[in-house]
């Protein structure tokens, strides 16, 4: 094909899903001329599966994206139709925000955000090859014959590389929602030396709202007080749409088991790996055979559509079996399927080929993010896109990568898990993956990360000033709580009325608030609150810091120990095969992963404590030969 020079950019982003949008906005907002290429303008920030943002572990990622200056939190705050804080019966370490989105408005808002960004161009085309000179990437070539040159390329291809749809015996190459698929790019990546693999995911059917009997389902309403995803917002309350809960039946199970061999998953047609924590209904029935019923959530896809998403019943069964199966579910007996369920298989990369900066090892200036890296979920994708965008800019500027470690952010946990351990299935973030989750709460993401975002040039002045004001307000209120006191006379009658233990002597509000039964609302009832001048989120911060102070201090000490190993840096040019004392497996793994620190090396499967001791001795020898300077 004849190529023509179509333009020069600092950064080119391939794909405009959740990863691509964050990557392109980050590079453009940091002052670099950016091009984002998508196969369809109608698929920008598409939600091809669940129409929601957030959830357990995922809400934390969105809050962190926002704290660093990303877009996802702002976008969902504009377009949510129901919001719920999950895990409120547990401690704040696992509180996770989740919002149902109007998926069509979400797409429109993100598309408009891209269009309004001065340093960002949008092109509808298909990237078919990565242009390179040796191992240095210099741009991309497209299906329309365009040659775009750039200083960095970010791959955010989602599930579109050689994507194949499965519904029972029916299979065809296509992207989600009847969109096209990328047929040629994988070959170009293999030519560059990338190790590719096949993963699978799936989605349930969408059914017509008017064909559902909601009267036999349980109503699931949103929170009365809505917590925004973005730290730039305070009050975003509006009329919310209800969701509904129903369950499968024994008849559902019978339909599935009778047709199990017709499922693409169980007929042997699909051999790729699917997401463990989002199993198909076939997997649920087989793996949890003792259960005769599984819960399903009925969720609206938007305000101006009658499509309803049936969460919890993704499948690759044939369409006619789907029709029989859905009609065995309480409330769906007469349902009309508008879009059938399907499984989708796609190419992705082995993420152990990535540096922690998300640059491909051995290929200069090529970065990647999102499902291409083996993850699942919009939030995981967006987080990677943001970090890939930041680090593409820093590579252009000749600066060290921007790295968040496991003690600083869920984003740090995500990236460290991917590049250090790899993944054999689509990776999903969960609170249990974060060792320091009491410190890495969603409520303090701005306190942890906004200064960092400002220092690298992504957080703008208005957000930074808001952060400084909140920080000062928290410190001021915390000081007031420590200095202001309550007496038995002031509080005991109310405490006894509420069945709580009276106090014997006067104590500070800080000590009073430490008591399990004392809430900030109780302080306000006693006339001891800060009043309306102090925001709800500032009060929440003070309560959490006060009640969990001992636990947080203990975790901070653990983080200090963790940092000692993280701060012992390893040069990526080290030849591990030349270090005596390392076991053969450790040498191979270390040469492959190329960890940036002793801490990261210690988390590599196959590297033992004895191997770490050898590395520490090696670093000490290097330090001595350099006259005690550095590691």
Curated annotation (Swiss-Prot):
Keywords recorded for this protein, A-Z = Cytoplasm, FAD, Flavoprotein, NAD, tRNA processing
Q: Where does NAD(+) bind?
A: 274-288
Q: In terms of one coarse class, where is the protein primarily found? A: cytoplasm
**GO terms for CC?**
cytosol
Q: What's an example of a GO molecular-function annotation for this chain?
A: flavin adenine dinucleotide binding
Q: Does the keyword Flavoprotein apply?
A: yes
GO BP term, example: tRNA methylation
Query: Which cofactors are named for this entry?
Result: FAD
In terms of Pfam families, this protein maps to: GIDA, GIDA_C_1st, SAM_GIDA_C
Query: So where does FAD get bound?
Result: 15-20
**Keyword tRNA processing among UniProt keywords:** yes
Q: Where in the cell is it found?
A: Cytoplasm
Q: Quaternary arrangement and interactors, per the entry?
A: Homodimer. Heterotetramer of two MnmE and two MnmG subunits.
Q: Which HAMAP family match?
A: MnmG_GidA (MF_00129)
Q: What does this protein do?
A: NAD-binding protein involved in the addition of a carboxymethylaminomethyl (cmnm) group at the wobble position (U34) of certain tRNAs, forming tRNA-cmnm(5)s(2)U34.
Q: Which family does it belong to?
A: Belongs to the MnmG family.
- Name by which UniProt lists this protein: tRNA uridine 5-carboxymethylaminomethyl modification enzyme MnmG
Originating species: Clostridioides difficile (strain 630)
Task: Quote the gene name from the UniProt entry.
Answer: mnmG
């Amino acid at each position: 094909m004849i190529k023509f020079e179509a333009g020069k950019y600092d950064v080119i982003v391939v794909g405009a899903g959740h990863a691509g949008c964050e990557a392109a906005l980050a590079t453009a907002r940091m002052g670099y001329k950016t091009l984002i290429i998508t196969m369809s303008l109608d698929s920008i920030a598409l939600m091809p599966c669940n129409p929601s943002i957030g959830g357990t572990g995922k809400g934390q990622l969105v809050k962190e994206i926002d704290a660093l200056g990303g877009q996802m939190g702002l976008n969902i705050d504009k377009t949510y139709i129901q919001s719920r804080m999950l895990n409120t019966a547990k401690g704040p370490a696992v509180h996770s925000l989740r919002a149902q989105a109007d998926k069509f408005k979400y797409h429109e808002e993100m598309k408009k955000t891209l269009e309004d960004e001065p340093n960002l161009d949008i092109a509808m085309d298909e990237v078919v090859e990565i242009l390179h000179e040796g191992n240095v990437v210099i741009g991309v070539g497209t299906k329309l014959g365009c040659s775009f040159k750039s200083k960095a390329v970010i791959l955010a291809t989602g599930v579109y590389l050689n994507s194949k749809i499965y519904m029972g015996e029916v299979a065809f190459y296509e992207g989600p929602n009847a969109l096209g698929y990328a047929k040629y790019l994988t070959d170009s990546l293999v030519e560059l030396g990338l190790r590719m693999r096949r993963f699978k995911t799936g989605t349930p059917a969408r059914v017509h709202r008017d064909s559902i009997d909601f009267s036999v389902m349980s109503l699931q309403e949103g929170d009365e007080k809505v917590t925004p995803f973005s730290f730039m917002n305070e009050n975003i309350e509006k009329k919310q749409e209800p969701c509904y809960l129903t369950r499968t039946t024994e008849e559902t199970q019978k339909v599935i088991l009778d047709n199990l061999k017709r499922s693409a998953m169980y007929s042997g047609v699909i051999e790729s790996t699917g997401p463990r924590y989002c199993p198909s209904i076939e997997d649920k029935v087989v793996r949890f055979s003792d259960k005769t019923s599984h819960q399903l959530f009925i969720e609206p896809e938007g305000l101006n559509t009658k499509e309803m998403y049936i969460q919890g019943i993704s499948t690759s069964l044939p369409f006619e079996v789907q029709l029989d199966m859905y009609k065995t579910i309480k409330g769906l007996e007469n349902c009309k399927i508008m879009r059938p369920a399907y499984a989708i298989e796609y190419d992705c990369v082995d993420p152990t080929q990535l540096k922690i900066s998300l640059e491909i090892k051995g290929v200069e200036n090529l970065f990647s993010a999102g499902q291409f890296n083996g993850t699942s979920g919009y939030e995981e994708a967006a987080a990677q896109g943001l970090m890939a965008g930041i680090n593409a800019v820093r590579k252009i500027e000749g600066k060290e990568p921007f790295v968040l470690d496991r003690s600083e952010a869920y984003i740090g946990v995500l990236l460290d898990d991917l590049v250090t351990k790899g993944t054999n299935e689509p990776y999903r973030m969960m609170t249990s993956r974060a060792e320091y989750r009491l410190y890495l709460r969603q409520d303090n993401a701005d306190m942890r990360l906004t200064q960092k975002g400002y220092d690298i040039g992504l957080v703008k002045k208005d957000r930074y000033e808001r952060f400084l004001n909140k920080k000062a307000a928290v410190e001021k209120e915390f000081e007031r709580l420590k200095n202001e006191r309550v007496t038995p006379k002031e509080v005991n009658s109310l405490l006894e009325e509420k069945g709580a233990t009276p106090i014997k002597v006067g104590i500070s509000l800080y000590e009073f608030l430490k008591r399990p039964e004392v809430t900030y609302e109780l302080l306000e009832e006693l006339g001891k609150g800060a009043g309306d001048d102090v925001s709800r989120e500032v009060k929440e911060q003070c309560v959490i810091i006060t009640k969990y102070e001992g636990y947080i201090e203990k975790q901070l000490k653990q983080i200090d120990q963790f940092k000692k190993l993280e701060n012992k840096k390893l040069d990526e040019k080290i030849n591990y095969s030349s270090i005596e004392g390392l076991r053969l497996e450790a040498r191979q793994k270390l040469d492959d992963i190329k960890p940036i620190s002793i801490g990261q090396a210690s988390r590599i499967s196959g590297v033992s404590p004895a191997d770490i001791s050898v590395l520490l001795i090696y670093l000490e020898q290097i330090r001595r030969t350099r006259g005690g300077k550095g590691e």
